[in-house]
Design a protein with these regions (language model features):
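Short polybasic/polar patches that bind polyanions
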Residues: 16, 47, 104-106
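Hinge/beta->alpha junction and helix N-cap segments in small-molecule ligand-binding domains
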Residues: 1-10, 26-74, 89-97, 119-121, ...
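Short acidic capping loops at alpha-helix termini that bridge into adjacent secondary structure
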Residues: 21-22, 53-57, 110-115
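Alpha-helical recognition/docking segments in bacterial nutrient-uptake
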Residues: 1-13, 17, 79-80, 84
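Flexible loop/turn connectors
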Residues: 74-185
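Short acidic donor-binding loop at the edge of a beta-strand
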Residues: 14, 22, 149
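Residues that mark the start of a beta-strand
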Residues: 20-22, 86-87
Length: 186
């Protein structure tokens, strides 16, 4: 399993180091463990540096999964509520892509007017316009670790042994591309 908290801490730290203080968030659905963990990473970092998270700049995906359409709708809502945010951290790359498209249609240029960060590093994120800064989680490594654990369980079962519960976390990595830059100066 990817260390979601570490991933969002890296993402918000990147925005913070670029001078962003008015950061909008599109959270994942509450029912997903990933969403809870990612939000915890944001809160932990914000508390550590004294960054105020404005409740008006926090929206949540309502369905079980993110959709491009909902990403657009939530970004439109953020722009209506509080258009002065300088950065947006999205639950995933699909939502980030929708946010970029919506902001561009509204006349806000990414990253000049608003930096955007996603999460997952799906293959197409490098080809978005602009290429998306995102948190990479290695699905290959997660898959191979899962396969190793299954093999261990099979061997243990064949040998009539029990194994203690095991929990492995895969470290994510922030991939900085062209959707982020220094916060605009007012």
């Amino acid at each position: 399993m990817v260390d979601n908290e570490a991933g969002t801490r890296q993402a918000i730290q990147h925005l913070y180091e670029l001078g962003h203080r008015r950061i909008a968030f599109i959270k994942g659905p509450k029912i997903l463990v990933d969403s809870v963990q990612r939000w915890r990473g944001i809160e932990t970092f914000a508390q550590a540096v004294g960054l105020k998270v404005d409740a008006k700049l926090v929206l949540e995906i309502k369905g079980r999964n993110s959709t491009y359409a909902e990403g657009c709708q939530l970004t439109e809502e953020l722009l209506r509520r509080c258009p002065d945010f300088t950065a947006l951290l999205a639950f995933d790359d699909l939502t980030a892509c929708a946010a970029i498209r919506t902001m561009t249609k509204a006349g806000r240029l990414v990253p000049r007017d608003c930096s955007v960060v996603g999460f997952d590093d799906v293959p197409s994120s490098a080809f978005y316009n602009p290429p998306l800064t995102t948190v990479h989680q290695s699905l290959e490594l997660q898959g191979s670790l899962s396969a190793e654990m299954v093999e261990e369980l099979i061997r243990a079962s064949a040998e009539k042994r029990t194994l203690p519960p095991k929990h492995r976390k895969v470290s994510p990595k922030l991939v900085v591309r062209e959707s982020t830059c220094e916060a605009p100066h007012s």
